[in-house]
Regions:
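Macrodomain-like recognition of ADP-ribose-binding/processing modules
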Residues: 1-262
Length: 262
């Protein structure tokens, strides 16, 4: 697990010579538009990969492929097993560079499939599982030992990160694929729990984590609440002790009693 962008994962773990490229990266692609929202300034995962390389220039020349997707392959927003592979793309940041093959593939859009076509959850999971196998098979065909993945299909596409992570875990643990090293690049943000959910699911890889993320999160929240309650109780005790000390009757200096009473 990496709390980092896909580009950073490539720069940290890829090779600096194209002829020695041993890594592939999955671009969380738009199925119908080259680079997703890159030209509009959107910085999703695919757009960020475009910003750090010449990837968009290559994708922009494949408009016939994207047009074919729009006309014939929307498939109730599940899309189909179609991908582009851009070999040995150079990624640059701050005078550091590395190369990776880019697998341009779109996850099913669960949000639209549910809303517009009432696709069942089982059908959505089957489609995503099949798409994951499709991507891993492409990586095998490329012969790459390293693969950068992430929270593919989550957030705007409508899949829960824990579900996606478990599907990836199961396929990678199956032994059906040849990739030797997988980097899940999932930047942590305050807007979602993708990183925490992936980290939880993959904590015991290749074994399945028997506890759900919700159970672990609930236990952690209860522990935090107990700590806060204990701290508040201790603060109340300290304040009460201070009030007692401040307002308690004081004895005259030297222990002497007053010489007169009125």
């Amino acid at each position: 697990m990496l709390d980092a962008s896909a580009t950073q994962a490539i720069l940290d773990n890829g090779r600096g010579y194209a002829q020695f490229c041993d890594m592939a990266v999955l671009a969380f692609a738009s199925f119908t538009n080259p680079g997703g929202g890159y030209i509009q300034g959107y910085l999703g995962q695919e757009a960020t990969l475009c910003a750090d390389s010449y990837l968009y220039n290559v994708l922009d020349k494949q408009r016939k492929w994207y047009g074919e997707n729009r006309r014939r392959n929307i498939n109730c927003e599940l899309y189909r097993n179609r991908a582009l592979v851009v070999p040995a793309v150079r990624f640059d940041r701050k005078h550091v560079h590395a190369y990776a093959d880019v697998i341009v593939a779109a996850a099913p859009n669960a949000k639209r499939a549910r809303q517009e076509y009432r696709v069942s959850d089982d059908a959505l999971l089957d489609a995503l599982r099949d798409r994951i196998r499709f991507v891993l098979a492409i990586c095998d065909e490329l012969g790459r030992e390293k693969l950068v993945l992430g929270a593919w299909g989550c957030d705007n596409n409508g899949f829960d990160a824990e579900t996606v992570a478990e599907l990836f875990r199961k396929e990678l643990a199956s032994g059906d694929f040849k990739v030797k090293q997988v980097f899940f690049a999932v930047p942590s943000t305050r807007w979602d729990e993708d990183f925490a959910k992936f980290e939880h699911v993959l904590a015991n890889f290749p074994e399945r984590n028997e506890e759900s993320y919700a159970q672990v999160a609930a236990r952690a929240a209860a522990a935090r609440a107990a700590e806060q309650a204990q701290a508040a109780a201790e603060d109340d005790e300290d304040e009460e002790a201070e009030r007692v000390r401040r307002y308690a009757p004081k004895e005259p200096a030297g222990g002497l009693l007053p010489s007169a009473f009125y």
